[in-house]
From Swiss-Prot:
Catalyzed reactions per annotation: (2R)-2,3-bisphosphoglycerate + H2O = (2R)-2-phosphoglycerate + phosphate; 1D-myo-inositol hexakisphosphate + H2O = 1D-myo-inositol 1,2,4,5,6-pentakisphosphate + phosphate; 1D-myo-inositol 1,2,4,5,6-pentakisphosphate + H2O = 1D-myo-inositol 1,2,5,6-tetrakisphosphate + phosphate; 1D-myo-inositol 1,2,5,6-tetrakisphosphate + H2O = 1D-myo-inositol 1,2,6-trisphosphate + phosphate
Null allele phenotype: Tracheal morphology is grossly normal although some defects are observed. Dorsal trunks (DTs) are significantly elongated, and dorsal branches (DBs) frequently fail to fuse with their contralateral partner. Filopodia number in DBs is reduced.
Gene name, Swiss-Prot/TrEMBL: Mipp1
Main location: membrane
Record protein name field: Multiple inositol polyphosphate phosphatase 1
Catalytic activity, EC: 3.1.3.62, 3.1.3.80
Pfam families: His_Phos_2
Cellular compartment(s): Cell membrane; Apical cell membrane; Basolateral cell membrane; Cell projection, Filopodium
Lipidation (GPI-anchor amidated glycine): 441
Induction: Up-regulated by FGF signaling in the developing trachea.
Primary role: Probable multiple inositol polyphosphate phosphatase that hydrolyzes 1D-myo-inositol 1,3,4,5,6-pentakisphosphate (InsP5[2OH]) and 1D-myo-inositol hexakisphosphate (InsP6) to a range of less phosphorylated inositol phosphates. This regulates the availability of these various small molecule second messengers and metal chelators which control many aspects of cell physiology. May have a dual substrate specificity, and function as a 2,3-bisphosphoglycerate 3-phosphatase hydrolyzing 2,3-bisphosphoglycerate to 2-phosphoglycerate.
Similarity comment text for this entry: Belongs to the histidine acid phosphatase family. MINPP1 subfamily.
Domain of life of the native organism: Eukaryota
Amino acid sequence: MRLLILLLLPLVAIAQDDYCFSKDTSRLQTRQFSSKTAYQIVKGTDIDKQYLVPGCQPQKMWIFHRHGTRLPKKSMINKASRVAELRDLIINNYQVARTKPETDALCQTDLIAIKLWKWNSSITPDMEEYLTAQGYEDLRGTAKLYQRYYPTVLTANYNDTYYQFRHTDTQRTTESFKAFAEGLFGSQNAAHPVEIPKQDLLLRPYDYCSSFKNVNYKDEGSEYYKFHQSKLYNDTLADISTRLGFLYTLEEADIKLMYDMCRYEQAWNVDRNSVWCGAFLPEQITVFEYLEDLKYYYGSGYGFPENAHLNCRLVQDLLTHLSNPVSPHVVAHFGHSTGLLTLLTALGIQKDDIKLRADNYDSLTSRRWKSSLIDPFAANFVAVKYDCPADLDREKVVFFLNQQAVQLDWCSVGLCKWSDVLEKYKTIADADCGEYYCRTGGAPSLGSGVGGLLATTLAAMLVYLMH
């Protein structure tokens, strides 16, 4: 008997070595789901140490908020039956064909979870990209949090002069605005957004720039393409297939379908294990994250210099509103991933010293440009303007990204002089956005630029002095 136990010990050790998502208490890979990452998992935790500026009082706030957690596009919803087919194939591999791999196999609890998985049939194609219940709570929660730290700015009584809200023409941003307003003012409130213009050049400039839309950052020769074709990436696809009991490499579309199901279901139910995340080892998720980061880096980030021009109007909007001494005191925009990423790019936030490439995956594990941390569902960029009467430069600002103070090398531990902000972004402030924002020209000029910025500020100051 003792000999039998000794012989079985190596087998037990092997079984215990198999990674088990359902038993992993840290689940660090859930922080690496790129733009499908749950906000509650990656949001900052130090705002309570960063919001209070000694000798200063918060005066104004400018917000750009990505919509909360949403449903997938119609194309993915229509593939739910394929996910069920993959489920059955995996179970057959393990229980009938007996093609379970010797190492890195699914643990029993993850296998059972996959076997019991069913698609939520209440999610239909006509609901594509709708805000989910968790997405609504994401926005309601961020409003409550910022109001807790800035009660004198984010007042609980709605006033359409004091507050200005704006969102794009989609269900997910409309509902995100409503959730945010509920977080500030309660469920029975009169908050309303400004009218959406026919051409939304402020929140969706990328829709009106043909050269931006026509750039193929995934074409042959691109860094995305090179990484996609790399041995590391294709070995990852093969290893995932083996882990699931297949004797051949699955089509990438099938693997990505399981990966997306993992990401979405984790974001929909933050406190529960997403069944399909068990299909992947943590290091495989890291590879997928880098491919996503390359996509966003070149599609909306620092990969192409022109991307920094695209959100010219939004940067001017920020500078104009925070420069004016009069209302609105709170400006909040509700938009999308591309809007947020191009805004951060225009402001030089989360910029790496070395460009992301296909060949420097290993050396950029600590990169600043991580879409999972920058651009999760419900990502938000908040600028808080302070008045510091005892200082020579009495106007200051702190930028927050997902509840974490942004560290810029020309600021002091996250606190920036407003005069430095105006100087740093002078090129954009002075620009005629109609000509500046699009690589080959865009919509006609709307009279923006330094003239418009100064004129607006001076007019506001005159009104302020007259009162």
